[in-house]
Amino acid sequence: PVRGYYLDETRGRVLTLSYLKQVADRMAYYKLNQLQLYVEHTYLFSGLSEMWRDETPLTAEEIRELDAYCAKLHIELVPSIATFGHLYMLLSTKSYGDLCEFPDSWKEPFSFWDRMQHHTVDVSGGRAIELIKAMIEEYMALFATDKFNICADETFDLGKGKSKPLADEKGVHRLYIDYVKELCEFLVAKGKKPMFWGDIICAQPELIKELPEE
């Protein structure tokens, strides 16, 4: 059975590789066997320096080293990133602010509440999902596991801004499942098993059958 721990590496100081290894050591002591590492601006994504330039993000080399370290402790290290909702650090940049459900989001002053409640990607255009796929592909390459958590939670703004006409036509839940399905199929094609949170899909659980069996 999976005995896991979910580590949110996006709040406050970025945890160092040394500290993350200590987390793995403690997990091994308590016989936990899966660590999910959630990042946003705290990983050095290629071409997204606007998102992480004010931080000390984890590098690809550090992630690979942590993955190998966890494997020696019989811990599966699983990648996890935001792909849909609360993408504050990405969607508040000048280069990618136009991908937000609400325009000019990058001009708004920071607040923790706003960060969590808003900054959902605009699904009515194709540019957002292609960027997200590129981020997924880059991050998943650093892990030995066949699992990937796309999160897809807290999409509170979906259908309320740029995608409202589409939501009025198809329904908000249709927009949600179509977007998540495309990401899941992308992962399955890469040999991965997608995972995501159930807070949104549970409102219409019958839509789950549209997703890949993996």
Question: Model-derived features: where do they sit?
Answer:
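Feature activates predominantly on carbohydrate-active enzymes
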Residues: P1-M195
